[in-house]
């Protein structure tokens, strides 16, 4: 039986990944750079520092990585001033876990102000025993550090804790930490690599709830 559940946020709880995707092109254009194929996907699920590493990999060590990332975040923050929709099944899954007294945490690479803003807007903060941002951790996803810290705060063992993720880097992090890693794809479809390392794939959070109800997870 699962003893705890850790939620990623962007693209898993809220429909924010499309906003991040849209913001990459103008952020890069400000510095005279095109948006290369695969860049948004490679940076998905990482912190500011992780996104800088990805930019240097795509454009070279001399690219103004931090300037681009700061512009990316500025544009995204502007967009986040409007309500961002919840992903299908979020309310139902949270209610089921709460009813069954399974502790929950949010572990997101986004800054804490962004995480708290989304949770407060939808009135969901009370569900979570811990809310963790990766902005102050040394290692970003795909390292498992943020999930290990979340499990520690929940008081659960990784092998009995579910990680819900939509990004490749997040699935890699969950698998690396020894978690029950469930991929709920948003913009990134499951690949052969993901299928090798995740526990299972669900089409939505509604399916996650169904599998829990049926004892499949």
Language model region names:
Residues 1-41:
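Active-site neighborhood of HAD-like aspartate-dependent phosphohydrolases
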Residues 27-60, 65:
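Alpha-helical substrate-recognition element adjacent to the catalytic core
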Residues 1-3, 95-98, 111-217:
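Asp-based, Mg2+/Mn2+-dependent phosphohydrolase catalytic module
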Residues 20-24, 28, 48-55, 69-80, ...:
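Hydrophobic alpha-helical core bundles mediating ligand binding, dimerization, or RNAP-core interactions
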Residues 19, 43-47, 72, 85-89, ...:
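Short beta->alpha linker loops
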Residues 34, 54-95, 100:
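Metal-dependent phosphoesterase signature
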Residues 34, 103, 180:
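Residue-level detector of anion-binding/catalytic polar loops
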Residues 13, 86, 104-107, 139, ...:
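Conserved SAM-binding loop
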């Amino acid at each position: 039986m699962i003893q705890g559940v850790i939620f990623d946020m962007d693209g898993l709880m809220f429909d924010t990944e499309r906003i991040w995707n849209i913001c990459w092109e103008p952020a890069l254009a400000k510095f005279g750079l095109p948006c290369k194929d695969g860049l948004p996907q490679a940076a998905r699920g990482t912190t500011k520092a992780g996104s800088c590493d990805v930019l240097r990999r795509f454009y070279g060590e001399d690219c103004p990585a931090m300037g681009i990332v700061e512009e990316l975040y500025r544009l995204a923050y502007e967009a986040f001033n409007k309500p961002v929709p919840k992903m299908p099944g979020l309310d139902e899954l949270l209610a089921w876990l709460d009813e069954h007294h399974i502790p929950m945490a949010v572990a997101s690479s986004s800054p804490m102000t962004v995480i708290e803003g989304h949770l407060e807007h939808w009135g969901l903060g009370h569900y979570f025993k811990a809310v963790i941002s990766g902005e102050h951790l040394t290692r970003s996803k795909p390292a498992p550090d943020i999930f290990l810290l979340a499990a520690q705060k929940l008081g659960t063992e990784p092998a009995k804790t579910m990680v819900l993720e939509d990004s490749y880097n997040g699935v890699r992090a969950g698998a690396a930490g020894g978690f029950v890693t469930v991929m709920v794809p948003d913009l990134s479809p499951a690949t052969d690599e993901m299928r090798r390392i995740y526990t299972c794939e669900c089409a939505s959070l509604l399916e996650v709830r169904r599998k829990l109800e049926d004892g499949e997870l």
